[in-house]
Amino acid sequence: MDTHTTKLVAISLLLLLVISDYTRLMIQVHSYVPFCAYTYDYFSYCLDFLTGYYYKPGKKCCVHIVKLNIIAKHKKENPRLLCNCVEMMTRGYTPPMLADKIQQLPLLCNTHLSFPISSSMDCSTV
């Protein structure tokens, strides 16, 4: 092969890798969409508590946390997906969510969470 053909093959392979990575990323983002929609909707009932406006979570908050637990238990990958949605939602939220309120949420809602929420989540380990 001459150098022109070799360069063309190398560029084609590189382009194929870039497209492959982009496609994988789009599939991953697409898989978050339904989970994040539920997460944002259901978690919105808890924001007044999580940001410190209320001293305890409301009944609607706790009901929706139970619903998120059901979603988390439905498939093996759901806890990680929900964790990523919560992480994306809380990152940069103003006013910030209070770490102690996040930790109190399962206890005050009389439930055990099937997905992690904390101020220092690492969803890659879920």
UniProtKB/Swiss-Prot annotation:
PANTHER family: NON-SPECIFIC LIPID-TRANSFER PROTEIN 2-RELATED
Role: Plant non-specific lipid-transfer proteins transfer phospholipids as well as galactolipids across membranes. May play a role in wax or cutin deposition in the cell walls of expanding epidermal cells and certain secretory tissues.
Organism name: Arabidopsis thaliana (Mouse-ear cress)
Family designation: Belongs to the plant LTP family.
GO molecular function terms attached to this record: lipid binding
Signal peptide per UniProt: 1-20
UniProt entry tagged with the keyword Disulfide bond: yes
Sorted UniProt keywords: Disulfide bond, Lipid-binding, Signal, Transport
UniProt record, GO biological process: lipid transport
SUPFAM superfamilies: Bifunctional inhibitor/lipid-transfer protein/seed storage 2S albumin
SS bonds (residue pairs): 36-85, 46-61, 62-109, 83-123
Protein's name according to its UniProt entry: Non-specific lipid-transfer protein 13
Matches recorded under InterPro entries: Bifun_inhib/LTP/seed_sf, Plant_nsLTP
Entry annotated with the keyword Magnesium: no
Gene3D superfamilies: Plant lipid-transfer and hydrophobic proteins
